[in-house]
């Protein structure tokens, strides 16, 4: 339902305005990649994280990795914070560029709305992935049981094309080692 609403929202915006949003998101993404580790070290005192114990059972991570998972959690939260700040700036820019909503790209002919809908759906899917990925790092039995029982959430975290491997490397491998 969320992805259908995302497609509809993007289709209404049109490709011109949606491209402004995508480019802003891409720029924010690059800034986040460059700066998330420095911010992660600073937010440890302000963002809570439950300690992993020997009894903790995580769906996606073994115990050896889970004992250092707090570092990856802070890295992911820092990344999302930077991305969110960039998203707010992008939304502000989109308010001023709202006239692009009615400008259709000629080379797309009648498919302008489809391209815009797909672009917005991809952005929303990426945000859903971020949400589930951060949840997967929290060693709370209730949350881990949801991942264990939900094949959709499990698929999004573990099998999303391209992004699952990329963010595992970015947040887990690069941070924990």
Predicted region positions:
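Alpha-helical transmembrane segments and their juxtamembrane interface "caps"
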Residues: 1-177
């Amino acid at each position: 339902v969320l992805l259908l609403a995302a497609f509809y929202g993007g289709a209404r915006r049109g490709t011109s305005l949606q491209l402004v949003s995508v480019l802003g998101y891409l720029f924010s993404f690059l800034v986040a990649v460059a700066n998330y580790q420095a911010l992660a070290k600073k937010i440890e005192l302000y963002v809570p994280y439950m300690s992993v114990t020997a009894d903790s059972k995580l769906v996606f991570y073994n115990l050896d990795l889970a004992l250092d998972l707090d570092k990856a959690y802070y890295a992911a939260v820092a990344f999302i914070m930077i991305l969110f700040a960039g998203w707010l700036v992008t939304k502000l820019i989109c308010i001023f560029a709202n006239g692009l909503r009615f400008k259709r790209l000629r080379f797309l002919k009648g498919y302008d709305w489809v391209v815009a809908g797909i672009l917005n759906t991809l952005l929303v899917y990426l945000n859903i992935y971020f949400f589930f990925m951060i949840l997967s790092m929290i060693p709370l039995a209730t949350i881990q049981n949801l991942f264990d029982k939900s094949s959709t959430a499990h698929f999004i975290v573990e099998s999303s094309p391209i992004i699952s491997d990329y963010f595992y490397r970015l947040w887990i491998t690069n941070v924990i080692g």
